[in-house]
Curated annotation (Swiss-Prot):
Full protein name: Nucleoid-associated protein KPK_4227
Keyword tRNA-binding found: no
GO terms assigned for molecular function: DNA binding
Lineage, top ranks: Bacteria, Pseudomonadati, Pseudomonadota, Gammaproteobacteria, Enterobacterales
Subcellular localization(s) per the UniProt record: Cytoplasm, Nucleoid
Gene Ontology CC, one term: cytosol
Function comment: Binds to DNA and alters its conformation. May be involved in regulation of gene expression, nucleoid organization and DNA protection.
InterPro entries referenced in this protein's UniProt entry, alphabetically: YbaB-like_sf, YbaB/EbfC
UniProt-annotated stretches for the region Disordered: 1-22
Complex and partners: Homodimer.
Domain of life assignment: Bacteria
One Pfam entry name: YbaB_DNA_bd
UniProt keyword list: Cytoplasm, DNA-binding
Stated family: Belongs to the YbaB/EbfC family.
Length: 110
């Protein structure tokens, strides 16, 4: 049923190795920082892997414009950063699960 002699033990060992790799990858992801931009780079927002905002950079030329436009640019830059961190997380986790034979559409618990 489990591939013969030692099959279940081997399966458990692989599961433990996978869990260790996933934990390490999650720790690495938490340390990641990405920067999202809007307004052709005039507004930049940097967030970490936990989606916490680390830094906001605003080009001085925007401080003379209206407040509403600046708020929109900051929101757009944050959304861009969030999209980028999600993509990076998916890529890193895909590398961890690459050796697993998962059914199509299976979602990992992270």
């Amino acid at each position: 049923m489990f591939g013969g002699k030692g099959g279940l033990g081997n399966l458990m060992k692989q599961a433990q190795q996978m869990q260790d790799k996933m934990q390490k990858m999650q720790e690495e992801i938490a340390q990641l920082e990405v920067t999202g931009e809007s307004g052709a780079g005039l507004v930049k927002v940097t967030i970490n892997g936990a989606h916490n905002c680390r830094r906001v950079e605003i080009d001085p030329s925007l401080l003379e414009d209206d407040k509403e436009m600046l708020e929109d640019l900051v929101a757009a830059a944050f959304n861009d950063a969030a999209r980028r961190i999600e993509e990076t997380q998916k890529e890193k986790m895909a590398s961890v699960s690459a050796g697993m034979q998962l059914p199509p559409g299976f979602k990992m618990p992270f």
